[in-house]
Amino acid sequence: MTQLPPAIFLMGPTAAGKTDLAIELTKVLPCELISVDSALVYRGMDIGTAKPSRELLAQFPHRLIDILDPAESYSAADFRTDALAAMADITARGKIPLLVGGTMLYYKALLEGLADMPAADPQVRAELEEEAARLGWQALHDQLAAVDPESAARIHPNDPQRLTRALEVYRVSGLTMTAHRQRQLAQSTEAGASGRSQLPYTVANLAIAPANRQVLHQRIAQRFTQMLEQGFIDEVVALRSRSDLHAGLPSIRAVGYRQVWDHLDGKLTSAEMQERGIIATRQLAKRQFTWLRSWADLQWLDSLDCDNLPRALKYLGTISILS
C-alpha cells in the first residue's frame, strides 16, 4: 500500500504558545506553515488577533493569513479547500505541511470532510433577497429560527450571507443545515470506526498548553491588556469607519473585537470591555480544550516546559512522520 505523505497539526488553546513552537519546528524540519485560525484570515485585524508581526511573517511565511477583507465571510468549507490546495503544493515540493492554530472546527473539517450541502440556487437566493428587502433580515432570521433553531442561534440577524445560505439550503433540499451536519457526523463516526479518513495524509497531532489552567488565564489577561496598550481600540475605530462593516459580520464577532465594538457603541465602559474581552477569551480557550479532550492520538506538550522542541521531535520520530 502506498504510504501517505506526512502532515503535522499543532493545536492548542489561545495564548498557549503555538506560533513560537511552530517556528522552532520550521527551523529544524523541512516544514511550511499553514495558519488554522478563523480571525487571522482578515487583513487589517492585526492587534486583536495577536497576528504574528510582519517581520516574523516575512521570515517564516504562513499560508492563509491576510487573505480576506473583513467584509467577507469565510467558512470551514472555504478553509478546507484552501488548506488542501496549500498542503498539496507544499507536499509537491518535498516539504511537510505544518498546520498551526486554534480553530478546531477547521481541523475537524480537514479530517472528516463536510456535509454534502446543496449547490447555490440563484432563483432561491433572489427570492430571499427580495423578502429581506421587503420584510427585513430579522424576519428572515425568525423564519430560520422556526425551522432550524440551532443554526439560528449561531447566525446573527445582521449576517445576511450566512442567513441567506441557511435558508437557501432548507428551501432547496428540504433539510436544515443542522440536519445535513448531523448526517455528516454520522458518516464521519462510521468512517472513524472503520479507520477511514477524508484527509490523504499521515497526520501527527501535537497540542500545547500550560498544564496549570490558571497560568493560561493569566496569559490571556496579560495579552488582552497588552493588545489595548498596542492600539487595539484604534484598530477597531478604523474598522468602524467603514460603512460596509457592522457588528453582525463574522470578522467583527471575533473575540475581543466584539467587546471593543460594543465599548465604542457606548454599551460598555472601558473596564467592562476589558473584563468581558478577557472572559470571552477564556471561554474560547475552554471550548478549544473541549475539542481537544476528544481528539484521538494527541501528544500533549506543556507550554512552560523548556524541552518542548526535542519532545515534539522525539514524538514525530516515534510515529515515523519524519522517515
Swiss-Prot record:
EC number annotated for this UniProt entry: 2.5.1.75
Entries under InterPro entries matching the protein: Dimethylallyltransferase, IPT, P-loop_NTPase
Cofactor(s) in the UniProt record: Mg(2+)
Keyword Transcription belongs to the record: no
Binding site residues for substrate: 14-19
Residues at which ATP binds: 12-19
GO biological process: tRNA modification
Enzyme class name: transferase
Subunit and partners: Monomer.
Family the entry assigns: Belongs to the IPP transferase family.
Function summary: Catalyzes the transfer of a dimethylallyl group onto the adenine at position 37 in tRNAs that read codons beginning with uridine, leading to the formation of N6-(dimethylallyl)adenosine (i(6)A).
Entry protein name: tRNA dimethylallyltransferase
